Amino acid sequence: DGVEPIPRFDDLVTAFPDMRLNIDPKADNSVEPLIAALRTHHLLDRVCVGAFSDARVTRFADEFGPDLCLGMGPREVARLRLSSWRLPVGSFRGRCAQVPVRRGRVPIVDNRFVAMAHQLDIAVHVWTIDEPDEMHDLLDLGVDGLMTDRPAILRSVFEERGLWSAGG
């Protein structure tokens, strides 16, 4: 209802020192302040940064190298998809692919995509999954993470599968 204040990033990481964060800097002007905050709060072991902009992803890769969990940009995701069809595409910097199940009519996440990603030690996080049947299907494929707008449903799916601990 808009009555609670939106927390500042600095307050969030201070209030929840053990929380892992997935961060998508949505605008170019957010990159440098985020780089500064990651350094100030020593967050490299707690965050994964990914973006829909190859330029933003590259900026974080250049700044932190392999010390930062880096999500793949759109071009790298496309190369990983091609790699799942056994096409030679070179190496990857991103340590996780954060992707939709499909892009338009083009499927992205399938058993070949997940298998190739895992063969390359790349985690697969899929968004935005809100239906329990689809959650189960993706977990059966072996995806490493699901992003949802319905966390209570995701928790229920995890509980059904014995994947939810009392600590959350």
Where on the chain are the PLM-derived regions?
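Short hydrophobic/aromatic-enriched beta-strand-loop microsegments
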Residues: D45-G50, P66-E76, G145-D149, G162-G168
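Short gly/pro/ser/thr-enriched loop/turn and capping motifs at secondary-structure boundaries
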Residues: A55-T58, V77-L80, I153-R155
